[in-house]
Amino acid sequence: MDGRGGSNEAPIAPRSSSLTASHRTMMNEESITNLFDREAIRDCLHRYCRGIDRADEAALRSCYWPDARDNHGSYSGSAAGFIQHALNVFKTKPRNIHQLTNIIIEFLGATEAAVESYFTALQRGHDATGEIKQVLLCGRYCDLFQKREGEWRIVERTVVYDWVEKQRPPKSSEAERFGPRQPIGAPHPNDPVYELSKRRVAAKNHPKDLIGSGEEEP
């Protein structure tokens, strides 16, 4: 103590602001990477739904790594084999609708994630005898995702079934049921959604054809 009652101890130096800022930057970068990774995984899952519903081979293949495995109901084997099996079925124009909810992503490291997503699937089409069947399926996709060269895809999938309900298909034709509600969904490449990408390509290649030349009318 000095004569004025003060302390002779040296004041505590403030923390280095540069270290604090560096730490914050690192945390922000990790958070942003985490968000990007989560969104990439969700996008892959949603792309799978389009691929299976539209029988879009390119979309389906973009969801799995080449060495991926798929345990999918009665099918168990390579993902490539499942894709071919699905295309053989769904290219025959059945009604097929997949929806996803409750997507839970648990990272096992920087390049692996365990992902559970709930699905609801309504499928309607001909069986092996030619009879029309309709079934409502509910369950979960239990997926192991891997990130390779910056891209997330499925390396292992197990489909868990929680609900199966066979339904009586309507007797009326699609033309009668849909009536004026047009257009209706179709397999790749005939579904209207693919026109959107065509227009985007056209806009890049020939922007003036879509937005005008910019010249005043005479």
Swiss-Prot record:
InterPro entries: NTF2-like_dom_sf, SnoaL-like. It holds the Pfam family SnoaL_4. The keyword Mitochondrion does not apply. It comes from the Bacteria. Residues 169-179 have a biased composition (Basic and acidic residues). Keywords: Plasmid. Coiled coil: none annotated. Residues 15-24 have a biased composition (Polar residues). Residues 1-24, 169-218 are annotated as: Disordered. SUPFAM superfamilies: NTF2-like. This is Uncharacterized protein y4vH.
